[in-house]
């Protein structure tokens, strides 16, 4: 049983990076597809579409920082909290990345037809980013209370 707890602990240490990267990749792909379509339909301003499509990549950065904050010798005593925090924040980053990609795709679609709303169209993506920040901050706070 102790070995399983240690294995799960190590899984929890790496989960934020893996799941954050997965969410970022899916989100960037969704927004990137919208950017490619928008570039076909507009004459200029391609850089803003590409820039917006990169917004979901922040989730993997949060995952990397969380991984470093969780990194320690994994024991049967701290394996369960490491697994719980790491896997739950990883799942949050996964979903935020996907939904942020969708929000960015919508912003791209809206602003290609009406460029003057570009900044406002990004607001939903920024709001979704806030949930990643909440998960990130709470994971950092909880990671500090896990015994080494």
Regions found by a protein language model. Give the residues of each.
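Hydrophobic, small-residue-rich transmembrane alpha-helices and their short perimembrane loops
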Residues: 1-148
């Amino acid at each position: 049983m102790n070995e399983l707890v240690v294995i799960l602990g190590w899984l929890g240490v790496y989960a934020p990076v893996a799941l954050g990267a997965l969410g970022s990749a899916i989100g960037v792909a969704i927004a990137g597809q919208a950017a490619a379509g928008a570039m076909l339909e507009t004459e200029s301003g391609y850089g803003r579409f590409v820039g917006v499509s990169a917004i979901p990549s922040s989730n993997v950065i949060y995952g990397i920082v969380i991984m470093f904050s969780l990194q320690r010798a994994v024991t049967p005593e701290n394996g369960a909290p490491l697994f719980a925090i790491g896997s739950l924040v990883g799942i949050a980053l996964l979903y935020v990345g996907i939904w942020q990609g969708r929000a960015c795709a919508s912003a791209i679609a809206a602003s290609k037809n009406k460029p003057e709303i570009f900044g406002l169209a990004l607001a939903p993506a920024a709001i979704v980013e806030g949930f990643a920040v909440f998960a990130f901050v709470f994971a950092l706070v909880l990671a500090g209370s896990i015994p080494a």
